[in-house]
A protein has these predicted regions:
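N-terminal Rossmann-like NAD(P)+-binding domain of SDR-like oxidoreductases, especially those catalyzing
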Residues: 1-141
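NAD(P)-dependent short-chain dehydrogenase/reductase
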Residues: 99, 122-171
Length: 171
């Protein structure tokens, strides 16, 4: 969705002296200098979406979701950041044999997108074990509420219903 809508979501934070918006590509930026003085990093950046991750799109997803995360973990370690909170996805679960799943169930992603998010989770674990970078991965499902993505199901369904349009379903 549009960068203008994303910026509008930051409206409350942009006026704070405790918030600095840095727009940069994690694969290219000087991350160590950007992280100086930080004690916690909330890694929310990623290439989202399942459908476009197939075929030719996979290299872009690998680059944005795996390589960028590895670079951020390296910078976190080098800058002495205490903790990294990683935004993962429910897509890592894939097709499970039982529901609800439990922490000990082996993830089985069913899309290249899910594979990249799980690979980045494993990188977080490796940096925690080998370098002492405290990490936690949050496996988001469809996020609903204020500032939700306008291109996701909840928003599309309710917008269509309120406007009297048919609800489009996939799958």
């Amino acid at each position: 969705y549009s960068s203008a809508a994303k910026r509008q979501n930051l409206e409350g934070a942009l006026g704070s002296d405790r918030f600095t918006l840095v727009e940069a590509d994690l694969r290219e930026a000087d991350l160590v200098s950007l992280l100086e003085g930080c004690d916690t990093v909330f890694h929310q950046a990623a290439q989202p979406g399942v459908r476009l991750s197939w075929s030719d799109g996979f290299s872009e997803y690998s680059s944005h979701n795996v390589l960028a995360t590895q670079r951020l973990l390296e910078a976190t370690r080098a800058a002495g950041v205490r903790r990294l909170v990683y935004a993962s996805s429910s897509s890592v679960y894939g097709n499970q044999d039982r529901f609800p799943t439990v922490e000990t169930d082996l993830p089985r992603p069913y899309s290249p997108y899910g594979v990249t998010k799980l690979a980045a989770e494993h990188l977080c674990g490796l940096y925690a074990e080998n370098w002492g970078v405290s990490t936690v991965a949050l496996r988001y499902f469809t996020v609903f509420g204020p500032r939700q993505r306008p291109d996701m199901g909840f928003n599309r369904f309710f917008s269509a219903i309120l406007a009297g349009r048919p609800v489009v379903q996939y799958g």
